Amino acid sequence: MRGDIKYQIRNLSLNNLSTRLISFLAMFTAFVAVGTYLHIPGPSSSYFNLGEVAIYIVALIFGSRAGGIAGALGSSLMDIFLGYSLWAPFTFIIKGLEGFLVGKLAKEGDIKSNIFAIIIGGNIMVIGYAITKGILISWPAVIPEIGIDYAQMIIGGLVALPLSRQINNLLS
């Protein structure tokens, strides 16, 4: 019975959105928002945060749709809340795509595919923010952005991989 919700979330579509599934997606979004809220401001409108931990956990356990929705909504809402509103539409796309790709490429119980998924999704995030920062702020400002984003990806992966395995075991 506990694995039932995981199956439902992994296979969600607009045709099967129940109140229960919407509630879970809202909790995942809040989880990402709280992770993103735990931040350290950086240079030129950057900030290091733990949002990747939450995005990767949701995507690894519940799949591409949940990872994409939670990543897009939770991260962009925190951009607005923390005073980085200019970044919110870009964050919506970048973090949504990151969560979607991690969930799509990951395979339950396969550590190599999960690491690969995080590397691909994380690099999409790094590239997305580098291009956005170059266009919105300046190209020299991209250098510190890349360092911050790689740190988020690496720390996010190192924390999310063992935690997602443990949570997955509890849900199975």
Name each region found by the language model.
Residues M1-S172:
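Loop-helix junctions at membrane interfaces
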